[in-house]
Amino acid sequence: MNGKSGYVGRAFPPQSFGPVTRTDFVRYAGASGDFNPMHHDEPYAVKAGNPSVFAMGMFQAGLLSSYATRLLGARNIRRFTVRFRERVWPGDTLTCSATVTAAAAAGDGADAGDSLKVSLDLECTNQEGKTVVSGSAEFLVSADALDALAAAAAVTA
C-alpha cells in the first residue's frame, strides 16, 4: 500500500444477512435476555400500533459488529459505536459495509509496535437501501494484515 493515506477511502466487500426471520429475533432474545414482546408476539406488537414484530436494535448492531470484527479481528477492536436509524422487520435482507476513514501510526502504546490505528465508517442497510444502523469502529492492526485484507478484497471485487 502506498503510505497510510492510501488506505483512506478503501471500501471492503459487503456482507449480507437474511432475509431475517421472527426465529432470528427469538434466538437473539434468548441470547441477550431482551424478551420485550414487541419483538416476538405479533398480536402484542400490532396492538401497540406496529405492523408486525420487529428486531431489537442490538440485533442489527450485533450483525454490524460481527461483520467489522470478521474484517479486522475481534482482538484488534478498540472502539465501536452505533446509531439506530430504522427498524428491521421480518423478511428484511441486511447488508453491512465498511469504509476506511483514517489510518495512522498507532503511537507509543505498549501494544502499538508497527501497528496502525484504523478507523472505519460502518453501515447496515436493508433491501430498500435504507440505513437501519450506522456506526464507526477503531482497530489497532498491523500494516501487513491490512495490506493482506486489501489484496484479498481486490481479488474478490
Language model segments and positions:
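HotDog/MaoC-like acyl-thioester-processing domains
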Residues: 1-11, 90-157
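Hot-dog-fold acyl-thioester-processing enzymes
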Residues: 1-76, 144-157
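A generic structural signal for short beta-strands and their flanking turns/coil linkers
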Residues: 16, 24, 76-80, 94, ...
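Hydrophobic small-molecule pocket/channel-lining residues, especially in calycin-type beta-barrels
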Residues: 45, 87, 132
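Mid-chain, well-packed structural core segment of small domains
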Residues: 70-96
